[in-house]
């Protein structure tokens, strides 16, 4: 790859563009095309989340309670990315979410409910969010599996007063916890069975049904390897705060096998976070810690000196975040990513561009401006794997999506992210909303990644590292888009249209 600046001066270098005193968002800037001598499919998107943790694809699910729990964590890991499980639950519950995601090697997680054979199912709520209920001798996890009841079978059961043991299906064939989809499907075909129980250390951890296997097998296939640790388990991250009781939370997470922790704060350049970084690195030196959030080089340098292994960049740029409006503090995300990356790379600290991602073009911009990964909230909210139930709003199928700075989220515990003390007056820095049903991340993320590859091809970058090299060697050029240019760059001039990306 040629990193010689073009002989004809055209556009601006990032250094010049971002030194003019303006705070730019992703939509404000546009990259100029460069020379192509490779196919889009040849673009290598492998990267690092932290100093020591590699990822096959540069995508991270945000630690929000309407985005990242067990299902999202297992799905993102299977795609080659990673999810950071939120901390808006008690420490033991968060550790259970981490354990659940790591207890299988398929992106299917039903989180089954349990019942004893003598139990009577009176309401569909007894199934929780699972499509079936496991029947064990003790009516809880850890007991002997006697059978299972599918929700649809219970719905069709005329006499709801019958005991579970009277109509449950027999226990299905078992498979090891780390069996892949092909192995599970093979067992189902050979046994003519509609379900397979996943077993680990003699205990059934989940039940996989044929409908789910066929659904997932029908999604696009990625060549990227899954994000798996040395122990063969999915890699999963988790968020934590900077208070004294978060040290106890950290113990639970480490015991659950967490691979990386994110110190979750809206303003990371604080004595509280600096001390927590040093504590984590001294007590658990093998555990990588990501600091943030930051938007300036000064903030970043302080956390780098404290020993962080990664930096989370963004303040007030999320779609549900009102920090810039309420507190008058923050920075345009494009400027923040470039500025922080320009100092972090000198220390070998990867940058996570957190917030402001609405489309694949924003991911291309974030990565090309120096970030190693893009963290997404609203982009993944509303998906099949996001927590919460679908509801209908004005005829549209939606899921709740809320900022961790919203009063609703802070009431559940996320105020630690925004308050350094126990202030009684809580000021919202986020809102509660809804996003439409997006389907499964296993379906739309592969298309998103292909769009990112095509964007990299257009700027002449055959890999994420080469994009960074082109940026820093002044080959990659940008311009600022006027309001009219932004309108022109989108769909315009039509009476009506249908926008489909894949």
From Swiss-Prot:
SMART domains registered for this protein in UniProt: IMPDH
Positions of NAD(+) binding: 264-266, 314-316
Keyword Cell membrane on entry: no
Chain ranges of the CBS domain: 168-224
Binding sites annotated in the UniProt record for IMP: 319, 354-356, 377-378, 401-405, 429
Enzyme's top EC category: oxidoreductase
Catalytic activity: IMP + NAD(+) + H2O = XMP + NADH + H(+)
Keyword Zinc-finger: no
GO BP term, pick one: GMP biosynthetic process
Any Pfam family hit: IMPDH
EC numbers on record: 1.1.1.205
Domain of life: Eukaryota
Cited function: Catalyzes the conversion of inosine 5'-phosphate (IMP) to xanthosine 5'-phosphate (XMP), the first committed and rate-limiting step in the de novo synthesis of guanine nucleotides, and therefore plays an important role in the regulation of cell growth.
Protein's recorded name: Inosine-5'-monophosphate dehydrogenase
């Amino acid at each position: 790859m040629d990193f010689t600046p073009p002989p004809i001066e055209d556009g601006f270098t990032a250094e010049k563009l971002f030194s003019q005193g303006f705070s730019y968002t992703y939509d404000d800037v546009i990259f100029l095309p460069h020379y192509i001598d490779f196919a889009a499919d040849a673009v290598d998107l492998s990267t690092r989340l932290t100093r020591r943790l590699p990822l096959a694809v540069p995508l991270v699910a945000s630690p929000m309670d309407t985005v990242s729990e067990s299902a999202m964590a297992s799905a993102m890991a299977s795609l080659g990315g990673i999810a950071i499980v939120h901390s808006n639950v008690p420490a033991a519950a968060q550790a259970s979410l981490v354990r659940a995601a790591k207890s299988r090697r398929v992106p299917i997680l039903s989180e089954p409910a349990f019942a004893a054979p003598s139990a009577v199912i009176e309401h569909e709520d007894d199934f929780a969010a699972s499509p079936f209920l496991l029947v064990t001798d003790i009516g809880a996890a850890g007991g002997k599996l006697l059978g299972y009841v599918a929700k649809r079978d219970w719905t069709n059961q005329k006499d709801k007063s019958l005991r579970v043991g009277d109509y449950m299906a027999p226990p299905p064939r078992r498979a090891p916890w780390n069996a892949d989809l092909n192995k599970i499907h093979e067992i189902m075909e050979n046994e003519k069975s509609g379900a397979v129980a996943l077993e680990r250390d003699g205990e059934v951890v989940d039940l996989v049904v044929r409908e789910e296997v066929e659904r997932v097998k029908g999604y696009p296939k990625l060549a990227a390897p899954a994000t798996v640790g040395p122990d063969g388990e999915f890699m999963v991250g988790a968020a934590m705060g900077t208070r004294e009781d978060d040290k106890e939370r950290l113990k639970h997470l480490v015991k659950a096998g967490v691979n990386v922790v994110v110190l979750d704060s809206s303003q990371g350049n604080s004595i509280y976070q600096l001390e927590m970084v040093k504590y984590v690195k001294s007590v658990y030196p093998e555990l990588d810690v990501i600091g943030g959030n930051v938007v300036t080089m000064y903030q970043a340098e302080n956390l780098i000196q404290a020993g962080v292994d990664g930096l989370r960049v963004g303040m007030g740029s999320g779609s549900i975040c009102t920090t810039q409006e309420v507190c008058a503090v923050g920075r345009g995300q494009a400027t923040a990513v470039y500025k922080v990356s320009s100092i972090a790379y000198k220390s070998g600290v990867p940058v996570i561009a957190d917030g402001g991602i609405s489309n694949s073009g924003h991911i291309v911009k974030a990565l090309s401006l120096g970030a190693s990964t893009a963290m997404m909230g609203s982009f993944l909210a509303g998906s099949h794997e996001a927590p919460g139930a679908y509801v209908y709003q004005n005829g549209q199928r939606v899921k709740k999506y809320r900022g961790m700075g919203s009063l609703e989220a802070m009431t559940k515990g996320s105020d630690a992210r925004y308050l350094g003390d126990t202030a009684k007056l809580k000021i919202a820095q986020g809102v509660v909303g809804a996003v439409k049903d997006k389907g499964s991340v296993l379906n739309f993320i592969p298309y998103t990644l292909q769009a990112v590859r095509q964007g990299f091809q257009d700027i002449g970058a055959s890999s994420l590292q080469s994009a960074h090299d082109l940026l820093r060697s002044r080959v990659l050029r940008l311009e600022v888009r006027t309001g009219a240019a932004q309108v022109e760059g989108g769909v315009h001039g039509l009476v009506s249209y249908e926008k489909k990306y894949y």
